[in-house]
């Protein structure tokens, strides 16, 4: 299969190198110097230092050439950008008449409109007259570094197109990666977005030294918040028990490679948000979309106390320790996700 990955950050590079073990893969990056460095050294020293990339992976600095590579039904374009870059890259893909199949990897809500990635893509395709494209999301618990190292992982592709799900499985379900299929695109995307916000909370708890019991409580009640919002938006409850819900939440909330968890830990240690983001070097989607998640919850009448507390810590100056006190002082209630 011919595959073009658009975006040479950590995740795009890792997935492209994985796919290149079995397919004809081109990795496009907008930074020509980075593309040249990867071609010369067979590594992405900026985002995945010290990890060799597959010998057959090819690199391209011209988007038109990368899209030429992925034309026709038996080909796939993968958009590997943060949510903020999704619309622009989708416009570029839509302008190329030969592309038929597109998936994206980003997780989050648009901070301005509150739109999920599939809604952003659908809006662009409607504007450009490309509703013929088969589209979907690939998501799940997967740190880019571990994928690049060839360590095992499992993911989910979500799309209304069974053919696209099957094609995506063929592209990536090999070697150390398993790919499951789902038609619950809303549920898959909500899980991938909300877990980033919740990971900030668990990181803060760990940074405060609150222990493993507190972490378990936050993950479990956070999952309830995710499920409440996701079902209110049209997702299926069982989706949140799977890889893109509980699975991704567990990884992001507890793994030391998690950028969102790192933000929470460092906030608890007294660093300012601006300082943390300046030194992080990567996007922390939980910070970008926390307000959008909270606004959607309030608009839908969904109770999300952990998420609301994260927003107050991030943007209103609430001390993490005070946020914990508030959560602990909430009235007793029956355990429920509703």
From Swiss-Prot:
Catalytic residues (positions): 195
Primary localization: cytoplasm
The organism's place on the tree of life at top rank: Bacteria
Pathway(s): Membrane lipid metabolism; glycerophospholipid metabolism
Chain segments annotated as transmembrane: none
Annotated residues for binding of sn-glycerol 3-phosphate: 107, 140, 142, 195, 248, 258-260
A GO cellular-component term linked to this record: cytosol
EC number, as in UniProt: 1.1.1.94
Gene3D superfamilies assigned: N-(1-d-carboxylethyl)-l-norvaline Dehydrogenase, domain 2, NAD(P)-binding Rossmann-like Domain
Keywords assigned by UniProt, alphabetized: Cytoplasm, Lipid biosynthesis, Lipid metabolism, NAD, NADP, Nucleotide-binding, Oxidoreductase, Phospholipid biosynthesis, Phospholipid metabolism
Entry-linked Pfam families: NAD_Gly3P_dh_C (PF07479), NAD_Gly3P_dh_N (PF01210)
GO terms under biological process: carbohydrate metabolic process; glycerol-3-phosphate biosynthetic process; glycerol-3-phosphate catabolic process; glycerophospholipid metabolic process; phospholipid biosynthetic process
Broadest EC class assigned to this enzyme: oxidoreductase
InterPro entries named in the record: 6-PGluconate_DH-like_C_sf, 6PGD_dom2, G3P_DH_NAD-dep, G3P_DH_NAD-dep_C, G3P_DH_NAD-dep_N, NAD(P)-bd_dom_sf
Function: Catalyzes the reduction of the glycolytic intermediate dihydroxyacetone phosphate (DHAP) to sn-glycerol 3-phosphate (G3P), the key precursor for phospholipid synthesis.
UniProt family annotation: Belongs to the NAD-dependent glycerol-3-phosphate dehydrogenase family.
Record's protein name: Glycerol-3-phosphate dehydrogenase [NAD(P)+]
């Amino acid at each position: 299969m011919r595959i073009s990955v658009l975006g040479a950050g950590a995740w795009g590079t890792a997935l492209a190198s994985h796919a290149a073990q079995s397919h004809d893969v081109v990795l496009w990056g907008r930074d020509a110097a980075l593309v040249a460095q990867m071609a010369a050294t067979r590594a992405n020293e900026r985002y995945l230092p010290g990890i060799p990339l597959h010998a057959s992976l090819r690199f391209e600095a011209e988007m038109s050439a990368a899209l030429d590579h992925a034309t026709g039904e038996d080909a796939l374009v993968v958009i590997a950008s943060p949510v903020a870059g999704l619309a622009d890259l989708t416009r570029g893909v839509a302008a190329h008449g030969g592309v038929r199949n597109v998936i994206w990897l980003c997780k989050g809500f648009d901070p301005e409109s509150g739109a999920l990635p599939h809604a952003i893509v659908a809006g662009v395709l409607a504007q450009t007259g490309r509703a013929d494209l088969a589209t979907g999301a690939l998501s799940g618990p997967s740190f880019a570094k571990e994928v690049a190292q060839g360590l095992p992982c499992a993911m989910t592709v979500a799309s209304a197109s069974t053919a696209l799900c099957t094609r995506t499985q063929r592209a990536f379900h090999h070697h150390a990666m398993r790919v499951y299929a789902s038609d619950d695109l809303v549920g898959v995307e909500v899980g991938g977005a909300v877990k980033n916000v919740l990971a900030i909370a668990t990181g803060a708890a760990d940074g405060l030294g609150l222990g493993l019991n507190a972490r378990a409580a936050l993950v479990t009640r956070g999952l309830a918040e995710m499920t409440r919002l996701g079902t209110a938006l049209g997702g299926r409850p069982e989706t949140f028990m799977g890889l893109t819900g509980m699975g991704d939440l567990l990884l992001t909330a507890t793994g030391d490679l998690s950028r969102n968890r790192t933000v929470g830990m460092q906030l608890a240690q007294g660093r300012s948000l601006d300082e943390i983001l300046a030194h992080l070097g990567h996007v922390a989607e939980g910070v970008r979309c926390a307000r959008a998640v909270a606004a959607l919850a309030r608009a839908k009448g969904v109770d999300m106390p952990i998420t609301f507390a994260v927003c107050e810590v991030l943007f209103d100056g609430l001390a993490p320790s005070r946020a914990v006190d508030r959560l602990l002082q909430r009235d007793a209630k029956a355990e429920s996700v509703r």
